[in-house]
């Protein structure tokens, strides 16, 4: 049975991809997570080093599992046993071949909207890895950056805070309080409107609800 939401998203994606290309980024459309996995396989040569930021979409699409089972070097910070080891892995991320992440929101103009706590994710988006692949579900499309920032604080952060047990208003009240708590997830806001190194950032639009 046809899904009108997916049909509408497919149409909207054409506009977004055109705007991404104008901004020096590559844009792709996939109907399903399975299609996205096949696309990633075609974009990422075997033997590449793989890093990723905090992203549920990377796991939900099955892309992470696929890469772990393939011939890739996975730079997994979760395997670090000390703060020193974790920092070393974070630094390796900057020199990785491919960095995977999602976006908190993506505007119709092709602008990536991200708010980060630890901020390794937005740091690698901005500089370092040879390629950045951004996996974006259709639930993250917004009209403009203002709507994108609102989406982060009202839709994305509360469940993410609950997942991470931050102890911030996002978790305890269910809405962003623009706090200065130790577990604050809203430390750095990055809006990516242009990519100077053409093709470095590749955005894959997936016609599914993914991530937060």
Mark where each language-model region is.
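Glycine- and acidic-residue-enriched helix-capping/strand-helix junction motifs
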Residues: 1-9
């Amino acid at each position: 049975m046809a899904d009108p939401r997916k049909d509408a998203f497919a149409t909207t994606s054409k506009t977004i991809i055109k705007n991404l290309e104008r901004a020096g980024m590559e844009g792709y459309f996939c109907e399903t997570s399975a299609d996205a996995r096949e696309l990633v396989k075609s974009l990422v040569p075997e033997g590449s080093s793989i890093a990723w930021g905090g992203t549920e979409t990377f796991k939900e699409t099955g892309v992470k599992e696929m890469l772990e089972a393939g011939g890739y070097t996975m730079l997994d910070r979760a395997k670090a046993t000390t703060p020193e080891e974790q920092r070393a892995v974070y630094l390796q991320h900057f020199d990785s071949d491919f960095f995977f992440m999602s976006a908190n929101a993506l505007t119709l103009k092709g602008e990536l909207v991200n708010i980060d706590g630890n901020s390794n994710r937005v740091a690698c988006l901005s500089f370092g890895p040879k390629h950045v692949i951004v996996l974006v579900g259709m639930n993250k499309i917004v009209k403009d950056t203002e709507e994108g920032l609102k989406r982060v604080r009202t839709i994305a952060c509360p469940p993410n805070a609950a997942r991470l047990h931050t102890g911030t208003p996002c978790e305890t009240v269910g809405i962003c309080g623009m706090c200065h708590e130790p577990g604050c997830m809203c430390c750095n806001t990055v809006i990516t409107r242009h990519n100077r190194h053409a093709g470095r950032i590749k955005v894959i639009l997936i016609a599914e609800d993914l991530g937060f």
